[in-house]
């Protein structure tokens, strides 16, 4: 009998994408023997309304450049093609339509995001539709994460997996601030992405790039 397809879904603003994202995706892919990981750059994320997000075309192309050398990575335009705010529940429903209801989806998120997952739109439905993988990050208290995971298990009977990934203290915010301040970003992200940022002068001006 043919094995069910196992897909990792990694959503994010990717403004810009960096090695922390890539290391996390590969660690989860290996841990759960996923057929592939699909990166989903956010279109108009409701939680980023306080900061102007870089144009979706730039974020999409940077994600392509960062993932193109890994045959198990793909990039989807499913959210950047959608009008209005983009919510995870809508994205998961779309992937279920595309790949079939039997496909096992593993939504990859930072462990810190688990602390807010019950506030997400249609959280109860979302928790039933896909598996969640919480990747531990530097600076996040393990006890708080475990408490939240236990609470979700009791409420929904849903197991959220926790995966420890190599500790890379890299953030998109720091990269944007470094570029704006004229500081180096080498070795924080793929060289192809660094060249793209330089070519299009991204993150240089607050009013244009939302730094």
Swiss-Prot record:
InterPro entries: Cyt_trans-like (IPR004821), NadD/NMNAT (IPR005248), Rossmann-like_a/b/a_fold (IPR014729). Its EC number is 2.7.7.18. One of its GO terms (molecular function) is ATP binding. Keywords: ATP-binding, NAD, Nucleotide-binding, Nucleotidyltransferase, Pyridine nucleotide biosynthesis, Transferase. Coiled coil: none annotated. Pathway: Cofactor biosynthesis; NAD(+) biosynthesis; deamido-NAD(+) from nicotinate D-ribonucleotide: step 1/1. It catalyses: nicotinate beta-D-ribonucleotide + ATP + H(+) = deamido-NAD(+) + diphosphate. GO terms for biological process: NAD biosynthetic process. Pfam families: CTP_transf_like. PANTHER family: NICOTINATE-NUCLEOTIDE ADENYLYLTRANSFERASE-RELATED, PHOSPHOPANTETHEINE ADENYLYLTRANSFERASE. Catalyzes the reversible adenylation of nicotinate mononucleotide (NaMN) to nicotinic acid adenine dinucleotide (NaAD). Belongs to the NadD family. NCBIfam families: cyt_tran_rel, nicotinate (nicotinamide) nucleotide adenylyltransferase, PRK00071.1-3. This is Probable nicotinate-nucleotide adenylyltransferase. The lineage of its organism: Bacteria, Bacillati, Bacillota, Clostridia, Thermoanaerobacterales. The gene is nadD.
């Amino acid at each position: 009998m043919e094995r069910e397809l196992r897909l990792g879904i990694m959503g994010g603003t990717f403004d810009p994408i960096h090695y922390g994202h890539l290391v996390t995706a590969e660690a989860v892919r290996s841990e759960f023997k996923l057929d592939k990981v699909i990166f989903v750059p956010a279109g108009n994320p409701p939680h980023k309304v306080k900061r102007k997000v870089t144009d979706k075309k730039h974020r999409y192309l940077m994600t392509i450049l960062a993932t193109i050398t890994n045959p198990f990575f793909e990039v989807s335009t499913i959210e950047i093609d959608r009008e209005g705010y983009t919510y995870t529940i809508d994205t998961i429903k779309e992937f279920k339509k595309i790949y079939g209801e039997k496909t096992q989806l593993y939504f990859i998120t930072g462990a810190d995001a688990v602390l807010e997952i019950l506030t997400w739109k249609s959280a109860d439905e979302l928790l039933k539709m896909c598996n969640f993988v919480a990747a531990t990050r530097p600076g996040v208290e393990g006890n708080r994460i475990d408490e939240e995971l236990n609470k979700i298990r009791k409420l929904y009977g849903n197991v959220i997996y926790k995966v420890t990934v190599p500790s890379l203290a890299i953030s998109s915010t720091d990269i944007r601030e470094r570029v704006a301040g004229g500081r180096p970003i080498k070795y924080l992200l793929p060289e192809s992405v660094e060249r793209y940022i330089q070519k299009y002068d991204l993150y240089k001006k607050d009013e244009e790039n939302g730094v």
